Amino acid sequence: RRQRQMCIRDSRAALGVLRIILDAELDLPLDKAVTLTLEALGHGIVKDPTAIGTAVLDFFQDRMRVYFREEGFRTDQINAVLSRQPHQILDARKRLEALARFLTEHQAAEALAALIKRVNNLLRKENVEVQHDPDPQLFEDPAEHRLWEHWQVMAGPVHTHLQNAQYASALDLLAGLRPTVDTFFDKVMVLAENPEIRQNRLTLLTRLQDAFLRIADFTQLQGS
């Protein structure tokens, strides 16, 4: 019983810390805060700071999930965001607010999320890891050119919004990709027999995937 009471007190204390961070809009990374706290305590008091730090962060992660659920966010949305931003609760809530609004207000949101899942599955299946842009000289279909040109136009503004934590604005722009992406999948066989063409098409898709992943892991969304 005493242990249960301590757990309840610890949970309330953790929720209190999270509430203070959010109310004061503190840009405080939890992992850094925990590390600095353990360093201040010293090795004489903390025998295994790495293990304790991991346990504390896991505990706060659980409390963050509870806190965000109490704020009305869906569990799958919380998981999607925390998988990309597990330590900065203020930034995580900005992402959650933007994601929830996007899924509620944009007609294309659910379909676009499904397309991003499809892209992710293709890239994972093909084990694609690229550090460069696609080569337009290898495009064979006008739909490839249109998608790449569309992405090049919006890439700069999207990047700026993401750098400034303007996630809602970034998602508004990304939503505009939906018709072009639809046409791409209707017209283009991504897994072409020619390995060079196939790799180039997958490289193009990684650019879209990367932009969405900088906000949340859309593969964890369950749909409405």
Residue ranges with predicted function:
Residues 1-5, 9-224:
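Amphipathic alpha-helical "coupling" segments that flank catalytic cores
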